Design a protein with these regions (language model features):
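Metal-dependent nucleotidyltransferase catalytic core
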Residues: 12-32, 66-120
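Catalytic cores of NTP-dependent nucleotidyl/adenyl transfer enzymes across multiple folds
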Residues: 105-311
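Helical scaffold of the NTase/Pol beta-like nucleotidyltransferase catalytic core
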Residues: 1-47
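Active-site nucleotide-donor binding segment shared across nucleotidyl transfer reactions
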Residues: 29-77
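Acidic-residue sensor for enzyme active/binding pockets
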Residues: 2, 7, 21, 309, ...
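Structural alpha-beta junctions
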Residues: 38-40, 93-100, 165-174
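Short acidic, low-complexity intrinsically disordered linear motifs used
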Residues: 319-343
Length: 345
């Protein structure tokens, strides 16, 4: 979602890529990586929609996922969070690719690859991942030459993330504020990290002295726990008799989600409402798939209107709920799951 600001060749000011050029660009990338001893299909692979579009369509960039530990090994990088990315950028520069951008927040190095001459640049993204199989799954794209979908892979991914978000969330600290309103102070939820796997995470909204609730959340990385980093692990978590084909496109995932194979049918409404709100909040907003029933679109838009009105009211009356003093904190130390629902102890 957030990497939209740098898609389409924007990171290195590259031009659009013709589908007929994709294989040539991948071959050039292979020359760079094979010289380091990295093997296609084992250490790296192309992901995304490039090469899977109709002949007259273009791509903004070429996405290539590479095992981070292998890149670190072949470059002799240190253990610092940015070391391998900076080393990769320096290595590309030594090969003459001097137009590059290190984007550690997106786990990638984007660089300009000359095609016909030095000024004819296209963008290639080397994305460093923990697990290649997982990343090929999460960043796969339908084959548009075979009309496998009407939608981008991103539309499928947002649904996948919303399913996980609303099926696996619990409040670990509930806060009563000084006006007796009740809000979440700390939550635990599962999140999909496209380059890493499915994780259990925590975040809170407590201020520095834990006497107030603030607007921005704080991630509690000490609670990060890997749940699975295999496609089948995620599939089995969500579906009975699920297969990787269920995740091929938005349409196939939506069909599986609406079927009796989905393990959490009681969460369908809040997933679909949250899904619409997620697409609406994208910049720019993404068109809602026509498969989504209008009732959920209406409920999402009503929630959006209410949130906007509340924000305007609090601003006009100088009320900052996320900065209000805490009256009482209720902590849930443990929980069990019964019939696919959480019960607090």
């Amino acid at each position: 979602m957030e990497n939209l600001i740098l898609e389409g060749g924007a990171a290195v000011n590259g031009r659009r890529i013709l589908q007929s050029e994709v294989s040539m660009i991948v071959d050039k990338a292979d020359e760079i990586l094979s010289a380091l001893g990295l093997v296609k299909g084992e250490d790296w692979d192309i992901v995304g929609s490039a090469g899977k579009k109709k002949a007259d369509d273009t791509s903004g960039d070429i996405d290539i996922c590479i095992k981070k530990d292998r890149m670190k090994e072949v470059l002799g990088s240190g253990d610092g969070a940015k070391d391998v990315y900076n080393d990769l950028g320096s290595h590309l520069e030594s090969l003459g690719y001097d137009r590059y951008v290190v984007q550690t927040g997106f786990n990638q190095v984007s660089f300009g690859m000359p095609i016909n001459d030095a000024d004819d640049i296209v963008q290639v993204d080397f994305i460093l991942v923990r697990n290649l199989e997982w990343s090929k799954f999460t960043q796969s794209s339908p084959d548009y030459t075979k009309d496998e979908s009407k939608y981008k892979g991103h539309v499928r991914n947002v649904l996948m993330m919303c399913i996980v978000k609303y099926c696996f969330k619990r409040t670990t600290k509930r806060v009563t504020l000084d006006d007796d309103s009740v809000v979440d102070g700390e939550v635990e939820r599962y999140v999909i990290r496209l380059t890493d796997g499915l994780y259990k995470t925590r975040k809170h909204w407590f201020g520095k002295n834990f006497d107030r609730i603030v607007k921005n959340d704080t991630l509690m990385h000490e609670y990060d726990e890997l749940i699975t980093d295999t496609p089948q692990g995620l599939i089995d978590l969500l579906f009975n008799d699920g297969t990787i084909d269920d995740f091929n496109s938005f349409e196939t995932l939506y069909d599986a989600f609406m079927s009796d194979r989905f393990k959490f049918p009681e969460n369908r409404e809040r997933i679909l409402v949250g899904y619409v709100m997620s697409l609406d909040s994208n910049n720019p907003p993404i068109d809602i798939p026509t498969e989504i029933p209008q009732e959920y679109v209406d409920k999402a838009r009503e929630k959006e209107r209410f949130a906007k009105e509340r924000e305007e009211y609090e601003k006009a009356n100088k009320i900052n709920r996320r900065g209000r003093k805490i009256k009482h904190i209720e902590t849930f130390e443990s929980f069990v799951r019964s019939n696919n629902k959480y019960r607090y102890l």
